[in-house]
Amino acid sequence: MAIKKYKPTSAGRRHMTSADFADITAAKPEKSLVEKLNKSGGRNNAGRITKRHTGGGHKRKYRVIDFRREKKEIPAKIASIEYDPNRSARIALACYADGEKRYILAPLGLKVGDVVIASEQADIKPGNALSIRSIPLGTWVHNIELKIGKGGQLARSAGTYAMIAAKEGKYAQLRLPSGEVRLVLQDCCATVGQVGNVQHENVKIGKAGRNRWLGKRPQSRGVAMNPVDHPHGGGEGKSSGGRHPVTPWGVPTKGYKTRVNKRTDRFIVRRKK
């Protein structure tokens, strides 16, 4: 995938870039793997805003992705590489030998016509799914399970991967995209390779309207609000807020750690950078 630049026909267009979508091979998704997707506008069941700066955006349909890869020992041929509006990665339509079709995350290097399989005897090549026990040290993997059979939860965004750093007992040490080193059961499943669409991080939005297409609403600074709305609000004329930066609920921000200690902390060998 390459990055496409535009002629500066307007201020918003000047620095805008986008993906060239050259890797996309199908215009429409597989109908049997598409579901309706309702928007919440950031509201919960009581109608209250629980997620600020969310709403609007282009209509989407949800593509059902196979994160579990539980269809073992049956080879699947890649029929197409497709765009998915619900994630940064591309998705691949896998047609299994028994006739079933499923979407999987498209790893870097996967092409139409390639054959992938979920098996303990599978080759170590992009798109094949194995338990971590069967994958050599130093291999890049994505779509990694944290609980056996639950489905992949780690390293699913465009361009991400984790590296298998060590194995000891029933656990393996994985170096995650955040820099965190974490213990994961060796019987958990992972897919070989790096998630595709690696240039996604280099796309520049360019203008506010493009964020609105993505369902993102504007953010107002706390110092521009009234005291009733934010701890930084109010003051005569322009003010700096008068205190260390905090959230609208008074919790320190910009570096303040808010992660709560929990039972799974013992599986973290080294914290993220």
Curated annotation (Swiss-Prot):
Record flagged with keyword Cytoplasm: no
GO BP term, example: cytoplasmic translation
Domain of life: Bacteria
Entry-linked PROSITE patterns: RIBOSOMAL_L2
Disulfide bonds: none
Function, in words: One of the primary rRNA binding proteins. Required for association of the 30S and 50S subunits to form the 70S ribosome, for tRNA binding and peptide bond formation. It has been suggested to have peptidyltransferase activity; this is somewhat controversial. Makes several contacts with the 16S rRNA in the 70S ribosome.
Quaternary state and interactors: Part of the 50S ribosomal subunit. Forms a bridge to the 30S subunit in the 70S ribosome.
Name of protein: Large ribosomal subunit protein uL2
Source species taxonomy: Bacteria, Pseudomonadati, Thermodesulfobacteriota, Desulfuromonadia, Desulfuromonadales
